[in-house]
Amino acid sequence: MFASRFDPSQLTAPAASAPEGIVGTTPPAIVPLKRQATESDNEEYGSHQDSDESSNSSSEEDEDRMQVDYGASEEDSSEVEEEESKPSTHSTVLSRFKQTVSLQERLGASDIAESKEDEGIEDEAASTHQLKQIPQPEFVKNPMNLNTNSLQFKSTGWLNTEKIYYDNSLIKPFSDYANELEAKLLQNICKNFSTNTFPIQSIILDSILPVLNFTLNVSKRNFTRRIGDILVNAATGSGKTLAYSIPIVQTLFKRQINRLRCIIIVPTKLLINQVYTTLTKLTQGTSLIVSIAKLENSLKDEHKKLSNLEPDILITTPGRLVDHLNMKSINLKNLKFLIIDEADRLLNQSFQGWCPKLMSHLKTDKLDTLPGNVIKMIFSATLTTNTEKLNGLNLYKPKLFLKQTDKLYQLPNKLNEFNINIPTAKSVYKPLILLYSICQFMAHSPIAAKILIFVKSNESSIRLSKLLQLICESRSQSSVLKNLQNLAVSINSVNSNNSKAENKKIVANFSHHSESAGITILITTDIMSRGIDINDITQVINYDPPMSSQQYVHRVGRTARANELGSAYNLLVGRGERTFFDDLNKDLDRDGKSVQPLELDFTLLESDSELYTSSLESLKNYHNNTAQA
């Protein structure tokens, strides 16, 4: 009924009855360096099966077998025999283990390695017979069919989501959409923005406009369900704002009565102003009303304004939106579009619980409470892949727009990146090396430079900006800073020690600075890595490395915007930061390009060292005087 168990003691039986004509030879000694789990299990089973036999006889058989297999000495065998004289169900396993350990102690590691290599060489020679393996072509993977990093979502909810891919070749003239767009809207686009689309604009307009126009002509009530919700992962500076603004203005172009039909939620006040400027240019010559709500304005005044004149489009931050919902300044009864820009940042922060509050009002304010009553458009350069965070938005038939790549994030197409590797011994001179690096790429650039430098903290921003100012004041004494002597250099810092008005003025001056030959430097933290649309930043420098690939994408995305050239420089100190940066690269798509090393001569003369030391002393005195004041 049951299969008989395996008895290792019977393994010697076939050897006794060898076929005739074959001369019996003693098998070569084999040293088992690593016991296999299956072997010990079989031996354990065998010891259980022979439990009714005397333990002494089994020990003697096992001892004889070990002497043949392993060539053990009499001294080792006697030790094992004494140990196995005690009856035990695991005597076989224990004796083999002790025998193996004793043999390994007597054999050197080099002998064991050489024996393994010799065996491997003999096996290879016997098996290959000087035959070479036929070369095989490299396996070609289709990115369209890959479950890549960007598609390795944290929930199976993404598996049934419609995915729409695009690439950098998808550029069209806006005139191709003459039959889909209102004539006045098309005129405003070509006049104020561009005559050609960006790839993300092309794919969204191709996917939405035909269905949108057809559905509006049939039934304005249910057009939101025909479109469904939209999620877009696109690089910074790729034209996302215009991509979602055009369908909104096209839909509301012929509206008769002003009602709140679109809410655009952004994370910062600076981004509010940029989106407002874009929509104002798009709606020129129309009766559409575009309003903003932000913390700088009086909440009471905004409440009065929104109650008296209901806008068609409202641009706000999540916290301010909650304030107006609580005060009943706005009603979502007629809402058709909900836009969430920089979605990953908004969804990672609660902002007074804005998301549950907004979804609750959509259920109570709207007469149509069925799913899909509002088109939700989610945009980000680093769109979250965590469906748990997106679940709170109650998405309806979402379409996910992705660049055709096997990476998690994509960088601007015209971005050039360089790594400046600083030896650990020279890290104390890092600010001086920063200025020297600027001298190097300014020597090959006849145009004015507008440089944005990212540091890790507010304190670092204040300290570095003042130190660079002190060094530049005495740059004539330095040999490495000779290229800066004839250039106007302006260095400022955006930090929390400044008032809001001061920071706003500094950013405005940096944005509108247009020296024909000079350097404008703005030092900041990651607060300016998002929502700053300054198209003529020539260089971004990561003085301190970012904490993640997501943060890196937003930093370097401040340059090479709107299909313009831009450069990013990474100052990496020692092997640790270089290794960390290599890990970041695994998530980034550069469209076939790579990060280039920038070789610099870090030899400093005595005059340079003295200049740096005196600047540090001046910085110390400055901070002491500031603290006393």
From Swiss-Prot:
A motif (Q motif) lies at residues 197-205. It is found in: Nucleus, Nucleolus. PROSITE patterns: DEAD_ATP_HELICASE (PS00039), HELICASE_ATP_BIND_1 (PS51192), HELICASE_CTER (PS51194). The keyword Nucleotide-binding applies. It catalyses: ATP + H2O = ADP + phosphate + H(+). Keywords: ATP-binding, Helicase, Hydrolase, Nucleotide-binding, Nucleus, Phosphoprotein, Ribosome biogenesis, RNA-binding, rRNA processing. Belongs to the DEAD box helicase family. DDX51/DBP6 subfamily. It is an enzyme of class 3 (hydrolase). InterPro entries: DEAD/DEAH_box_helicase_dom (IPR011545), Helicase_ATP-bd (IPR014001), Helicase_C-like (IPR001650), P-loop_NTPase (IPR027417), RNA-helicase_DEAD-box_CS (IPR000629). CDD domains: DEADc_DDX51 (cd17956), SF2_C_DEAD (cd18787). Residues 437-603 form the Helicase C-terminal domain. Residues 1-129 are annotated as: Disordered. ATP-binding RNA helicase involved in the biogenesis of 60S ribosomal subunits and is required for the normal formation of 25S and 5.8S rRNAs. Present with 12700 molecules/cell in log phase SD medium. This is ATP-dependent RNA helicase DBP6. A motif (DEAD box) lies at residues 341-344. The keyword rRNA processing applies. Its EC number is 3.6.4.13. One of its GO terms (cellular component) is nucleolus. Residues 221-401 form the Helicase ATP-binding domain. Residues 72-84, 116-125 have a biased composition (Acidic residues). Residues 88-103 have a biased composition (Polar residues). Associated with pre-ribosomal particles. Interacts with DBP9 and RSA3. Together with NOP8, URB1, URB2 and RSA3, forms an RNA-independent complex, which is required during early maturation of nascent 60S ribosomal subunits. The Q motif is unique to and characteristic of the DEAD box family of RNA helicases and controls ATP binding and hydrolysis. GO terms for molecular function: ATP binding; ATP hydrolysis activity; RNA binding; RNA helicase activity. ATP binds at residues 234-241.
